[in-house]
């Protein structure tokens, strides 16, 4: 655990500015920058512990929402969603005085969109290599001959994490629910002795979507399972669903979910200008067709195995353009365990008994998938 900490975050709003004050355990280095589409102010700090209770966002002023968490090894991040284009008028550190600890003070004022974009462009021009350093490169695609492995490789992806909490229940946060389930599933699979299992994250940290895909490809995974929990305005809706990749969504709800999940990098303050374009070629297209077919096959097995084990959403298998499912050579699915906005689902998803039962059922589905894959070959 980090020894440095942010003990509190508070706000001050006047007609001229909105002030953010972070109380710190000690003087810390920091880096602050702005991002567009949507308008965000991003503050990077060394790894710190944050207040357990998130302060209420100001009801007026220039801030819509603030979130924070571990962004990467040795780095924490605070992301401010602004109501529109803003300028950081001042940022300064105050030393301990009058009973207060170190304080980092950030003053935001309104500005024009043109001025906002000009400041972003100026920052990027002054640090030309920073984007390259922060970019997540794609793992080059080369068709691989099918080789028999001692153990099948499975990568389990706990969605969201760190600065991105995901869906909110009355008490539970998606990032915590899915990490607990991912660990339970990994333990269940390892106990079979049949699989080499890897987690994209094993703690409360944010992993960019492209990097999650890269992890699966770097391990030469035979299966990628991304674990999530959903939320919706209609609190009566509940049940598990499973998604596979398609550029055309199966329905409006699946399309909306994909848009929401694909915003994860935006929520975490990722600069898309730093990211290389996705590569397209005929070899990738051919490989992805086979991969999609295998993904659909696995999804069907999961649906059948889960019947009677947990509540299922109507039309349980759906499809849409999820960025995290885009490995061209790794069969991939995204499983929404249930809805944190439903009190019954939230209670089940928070239960170790339910978690272990469903992890066991998913393990059985994985066993069946690889048995049928071996027979097909």
Set out the residue ranges of the language-model regions.
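Signal-peptide-cleaved, periplasmic/extracellular N-terminal interaction regions immediately downstream
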Residues: 1-153
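Short, solvent-exposed loop/turn elements at domain surfaces
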Residues: 31-32, 52-53, 163-167, 343
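Flexible glycine-/small-residue-rich
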Residues: 24-26, 45-47, 82-84, 107-110, ...
């Amino acid at each position: 655990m980090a020894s440095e900490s942010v003990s509190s975050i508070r706000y001050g709003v006047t007609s001229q500015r909105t002030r953010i004050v972070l109380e710190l355990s000690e003087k810390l280095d920091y880096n602050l920058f702005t991002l567009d589409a949507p308008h965000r102010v991003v503050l990077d700090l060394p790894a710190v512990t944050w207040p357990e209770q998130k302060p209420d966002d100001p009801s007026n002023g220039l801030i819509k929402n603030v979130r924070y968490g571990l962004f990467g090894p040795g780095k924490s991040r605070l992301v401010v969603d602004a109501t529109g284009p803003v300028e950081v008028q001042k940022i300064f550190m105050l030393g301990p005085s009058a009973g207060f600890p170190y304080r980092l003070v950030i003053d935001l004022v309104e500005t024009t969109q043109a001025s906002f974009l000009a400041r972003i462009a100026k920052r990027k021009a002054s640090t030309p290599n920073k984007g390259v350093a922060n970019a997540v490169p794609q793992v080059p695609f080369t068709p691989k001959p099918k080789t028999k492995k001692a153990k099948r490789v499975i990568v389990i992806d706990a969605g969201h994490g760190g600065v991105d909490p995901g869906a909110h229940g009355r008490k539970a946060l998606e990032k915590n629910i899915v990490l607990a389930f991912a660990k339970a599933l990994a333990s269940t699979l390892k106990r079979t002795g049949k699989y080499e299992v890897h987690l994209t994250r094993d703690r409360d940290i944010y992993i960019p979507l492209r990097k999650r895909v890269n992890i699966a490809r770097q391990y030469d995974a035979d299966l990628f399972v991304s674990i999530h929990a959903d939320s919706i305005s209609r609190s009566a809706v509940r049940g598990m669903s499973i998604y596979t990749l398609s550029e055309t969504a199966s329905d409006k709800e699946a399309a909306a979910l994909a848009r929401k999940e694909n915003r994860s990098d935006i929520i975490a303050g990722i600069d898309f200008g730093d990211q290389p374009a996705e590569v397209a070629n005929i070899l990738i297209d051919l490989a992805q067709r086979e991969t999609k077919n295998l993904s659909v096959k696995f999804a069907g097995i999961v649906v059948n195995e889960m019947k009677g084990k947990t509540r299922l959403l109507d039309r349980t298998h759906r499809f849409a353009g999820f960025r995290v499912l885009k490995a061209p050579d790794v069969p991939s699915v995204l499983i929404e365990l249930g809805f944190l906005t439903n009190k019954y689902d939230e209670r089940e998803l928070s239960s170790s008994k339910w978690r272990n039962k469903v992890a066991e059922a998913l393990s059985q589905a994985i066993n069946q998938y690889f048995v049928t894959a071996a027979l097909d070959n």
